[in-house]
């Protein structure tokens, strides 16, 4: 047996003797290392004989072929195993921390594993759906929704629902319960204690004609049922002057001083508050507002009208800070409150006043009845306003669908809940859209069809009729953090007022997304795409003070959008007692289909903003806005040079912003969309672009709407341009020191936005 083993072992190495080389610790004298040949003891005798024969016979060289083959096989196997292990370990490192690397040796599945495998095969997980599939699912959900049922219910069960009333609160709790039934991730509400102005119960508001010489009563014109909130409560008397719509241009075209006089203007074009502010700036003592037949074709001539005169949003008696019950600020009031009385009158009352006026109006001002400019010399108008302040509690209702990956980033969808009067078009449509969208999107999430990366917040606001009070107070309460989390606001108020046109007002950051949406959504009446004009961006109107989206954009720096289906003329019943479901359904016979289209518009925006890894906000659109401003400023180069100033730094700021957007676009293209950390860092830079256009050089309390493009005040770019125009028109009213400040601060605000967009301070490369 030993012989066989030795033979096999020896043959494995080609029959060669086994040897090794030993290196001694001490060198030999001749410098050679000792060489020892190791032999098997049993072979010694054979080797002796072999050595004896070697003296006579030449030694044959042993064959080494078998040894080479063996070494090669061992090397190949070794390299294969090493490569396999390296690949396996590299794979294990890529697996998420929660996943353990499985053993390479297959084992028999346990009984539990077999059961789980069986269940997985029979009940596969719903795959994550993307835009094309979600668009179809949303459409199917909208097709089975009856929007008019909700609108009608709100009109029958919760009207009228003035802010703070029992019906307003009851509707709020109804919406809160609905959100819970829809199984939203979380539902809650917050309370605010605000001051609104209502008609006095002890004395009526009135408009009368009196004799010029004795102020004796000629005859009463009207004791209106409607009123204008936040008017000054007082009595004034003076001649009456017609100023068309009360715009700044109308007062310029009037070419007649209005100081010491009352002004009568038509409703429309601009808000009540702006009309009053324009008249007050020219020292008028009071304002009357009416709806003419040409723009508001209401058959009933004595329909009362409601509005507000606060040139701002939120509670005007807590400007810049939230009106929570526990806040203890000293008494203060907004600078946007008027110091003159304001009152709405019916068309019938306006006709009586025009019957006692003279001098023809400009041709472009002609209305449906004889248009006269000024009251007759023998008669004056007396206006009495007895409105009183009232403190009320309002509720804002919220529900959220939490995002799967970035729940701390959210889009907000909101609608006004209250209304002076029935409010079918003003608030019922928006509330219906809000409720049904929440239900449809929540169902899609529950079924595993829709997995939004970011959260969706649904909000029902109160006191919207008094200047977006509910929305603004909420923004003021969370001013320090909202711009870091909320990246878009979608307003649903007054979304359906007609069928012919689709109008949109929005931040430039949303233009590209809106255009894609318009290409996908069709007008249900015409069957045509909402995208009908490639030049639509140039026709976008600024958000007005009366729009709840305005404070999100101009106060908080959150991109916002407001849209509506409408006609060429204004919807005539807003703010009146005729804003009912019956009137709306007659005015818009395809009401349910139009409401479905409005919900589809909002739904498309919500889904696109929450499913993609990249944030769908086109920051490059502001390059065009800044360039337009620079071009406008270039028209005043001579004036600026005469003042010893230069536009060089403005050019540099504009260039830095352009380079910052280009660099960010390059970063976007180079990063892998699956690299969530880098994508989030880039998205955070994008979502703050709007915020960085809020001027840091003015106080949110003194000038709450700090946005240099869309805000209000001397810090805005439009105010800077208007001030330069004043130098050419009326140099005595021009303030050079103010202009220097305006130019410097506007330049630095743009530069600050460029720096913020660039990212870290070591990435900033500008000429300042």
From Swiss-Prot:
Residues 1-70 are annotated as: Mediates interaction with SH3BP4. Keywords: Cell membrane, Disulfide bond, Endocytosis, Glycoprotein, Lipoprotein, Membrane, Palmitate, Phosphoprotein, Receptor, Signal-anchor, Transmembrane, Transmembrane helix. A motif (Endocytosis signal) lies at residues 20-23. A motif (Stop-transfer sequence) lies at residues 61-64. GO terms for cellular component: external side of plasma membrane; melanosome. Its main location: membrane. Residues 231-321 form the PA domain. Pfam families: PA (PF02225), Peptidase_M28 (PF04389), TFR_dimer (PF04253). Residues 90-768 are extracellular. It comes from the Eukaryota. One of its GO terms (biological process) is iron ion transport. The chain crosses the membrane at residues 69-89. The modification Phosphothreonine is found at residue 21. A motif (Cell attachment site) lies at residues 654-656. A lipid is attached at residue 70 (S-palmitoyl cysteine). Glycans are attached at residues 259, 325, 730, 735. It is found in: Cell membrane; Melanosome. Residues 577-768 are annotated as: Ligand-binding. The keyword Phosphoprotein applies. Stearoylated by ZDHHC6 which inhibits TFRC-mediated activation of the JNK pathway and promotes mitochondrial fragmentation. Stearoylation does not affect iron uptake. It is a single-pass type II membrane protein. The modification Phosphotyrosine is found at residue 20. GO terms for molecular function: transferrin receptor activity. Homodimer; disulfide-linked. Binds one transferrin or HFE molecule per subunit. Interacts with SH3BP4. Interacts with SH3BP3. Interacts with STEAP3; facilitates TFRC endocytosis in erythroid precursor cells. Cellular uptake of iron occurs via receptor-mediated endocytosis of ligand-occupied transferrin receptor into specialized endosomes. Endosomal acidification leads to iron release. The apotransferrin-receptor complex is then recycled to the cell surface with a return to neutral pH and the concomitant loss of affinity of apotransferrin for its receptor. Transferrin receptor is necessary for development of erythrocytes and the nervous system. Positively regulates T and B cell proliferation through iron uptake. This is Transferrin receptor protein 1. It comes from Sus scrofa.
């Amino acid at each position: 047996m030993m012989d066989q083993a030795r033979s096999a072992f020896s043959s494995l190495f080609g029959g060669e003797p086994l040897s090794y080389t030993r290196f001694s610790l001490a060198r030999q004298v001749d410098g050679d290392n000792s060489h020892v040949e190791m032999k098997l003891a049993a072979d010694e005798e054979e080797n002796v004989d072999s050595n004896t024969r070697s003296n006579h016979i030449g030694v044959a060289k042993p064959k080494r072929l078998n040894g080479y083959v063996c070494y090669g096989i061992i090397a190949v196997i070794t390299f294969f195993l090493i490569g396999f292990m390296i690949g396996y370990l590299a794979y294990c490192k890529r697996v998420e921390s929660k996943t353990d690397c499985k053993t390479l040796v297959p084992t028999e599945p346990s009984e539990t594993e077999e059961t789980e495998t069986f269940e997985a095969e029979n009940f596969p997980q719903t795959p994550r759906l993307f835009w094309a599939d979600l668009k179809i699912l949303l459409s199917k959900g909208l097709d089975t929704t009856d929007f008019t049922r909700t609108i009608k219910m709100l009109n029958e069960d919760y009207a009228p629902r003035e802010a703070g009333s029992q019906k307003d609160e009851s509707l709020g709790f109804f919406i809160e319960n609905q959100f819970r039934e829809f199984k939203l991730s979380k539902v809650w509400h917050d309370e605010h204690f605000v001051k609104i102005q209502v008609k006095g119960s002890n004395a009526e508001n009135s408009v009368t004609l009196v004799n010029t010489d004795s102020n004796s009563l000629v005859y009463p014109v009207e004791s209106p049922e409607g009123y204008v909130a936040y008017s000054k409560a007082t009595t004034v008397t003076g001649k009456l002057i017609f100023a068309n719509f009360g715009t700044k241009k109308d007062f310029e075209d009037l070419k007649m001083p209005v100081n010491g006089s009352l002004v009568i203007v038509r409703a429309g074009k601009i808000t009540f508050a702006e009309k009053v502010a324009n008249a007050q700036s020219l020292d008028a003592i009071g304002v009357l507002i009416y709806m003419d037949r040409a723009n508001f074709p209401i058959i009933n001539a004595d329909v009362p009208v409601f509005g507000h005169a606060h040139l701002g949003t939120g509670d005007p008696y807590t400007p810049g800070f939230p009106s929570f019950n526990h806040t203890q600020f000293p008494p203060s009031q907004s600078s946007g409150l008027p110091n003159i009385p304001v009152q709405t009158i019916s068309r019938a009352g306006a006709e009586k006043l025009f019957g006692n006026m003279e001098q023809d109006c400009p041709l472009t001002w002609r209305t449906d009845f004889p248009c006269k400019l000024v009251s007759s010399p023998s008669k004056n108008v007396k206006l009495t306003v007895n409105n009183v302040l009232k403190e009320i509690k309002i509720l804002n209702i919220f529900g959220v669908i939490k995002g799967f990956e970035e729940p701390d980033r959210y889009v907000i969808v909101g609608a006004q809940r209250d209304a002076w009067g029935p409010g079918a078009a003003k608030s019922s449509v928006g509330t219906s859209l809000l409720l049904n969208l929440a239900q449809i999107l929540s169902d899609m999430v529950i079924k595993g069809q829709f997995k939004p990366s970011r959260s969706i917040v649904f909000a029902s606001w109160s006191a919207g009729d008094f200047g977006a009070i509910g929305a603004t107070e909420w923004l003021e309460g969370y001013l320090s953090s909202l711009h870091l989390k909320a990246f878009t606001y979608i307003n649903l108020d007054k979304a359906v007022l007609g069928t012919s046109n689709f109008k949109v007002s929005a931040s430039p950051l949303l233009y590209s997304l809106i255009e894609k949406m318009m290409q996908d959504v069709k007008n249900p009446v015409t069957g045509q795409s909402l995208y009908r004009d490639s030049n639509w961006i140039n026709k976008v109107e600024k958000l007005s003070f009366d729009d709840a989206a305005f404070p999100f954009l101009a106060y908080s720096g959150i991109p916002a959008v407001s849209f509506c289906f409408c006609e060429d003329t204004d919807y005539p019943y807003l703010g009146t007692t005729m804003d009912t479901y019956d009137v709306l359904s007659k005015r818009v016979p395809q009401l349910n289909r139009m409401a479905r289209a409005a919900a589809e518009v909002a739904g498309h925006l919500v889904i696109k903003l929450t499913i993609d890894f990249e944030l769908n906000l086109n920051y490059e659109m502001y390059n065009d806005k800044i360039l337009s401003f620079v071009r406008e400023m270039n028209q005043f180069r001579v004036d600026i040079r005469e003042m010893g100033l230069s536009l060089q730094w403005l050019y540099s700021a504009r260039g830095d912003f352009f380079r910052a957007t280009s660099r960010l676009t390059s970063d976007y293209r180079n990063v892998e969309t699956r690299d969530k950390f880098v994508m989030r860092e880039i998205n955070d830079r994008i979502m703050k672009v709007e915020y960085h256009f809020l001027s840091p050089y003015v106080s949110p309390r003194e000038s709450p709407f700090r946005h240099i493009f869309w805000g209000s005040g001397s810090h805005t770019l439009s105010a800077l341009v208007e001030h330069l125009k004043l130098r050419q028109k009326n140099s005595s009213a021009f303030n050079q020191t103010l202009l220097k400040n305006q130019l410097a601060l506007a330049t630095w605000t743009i530069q600050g936005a460029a720096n913020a967009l660039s990212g870290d301070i070591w990435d900033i490369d500008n000429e300042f």
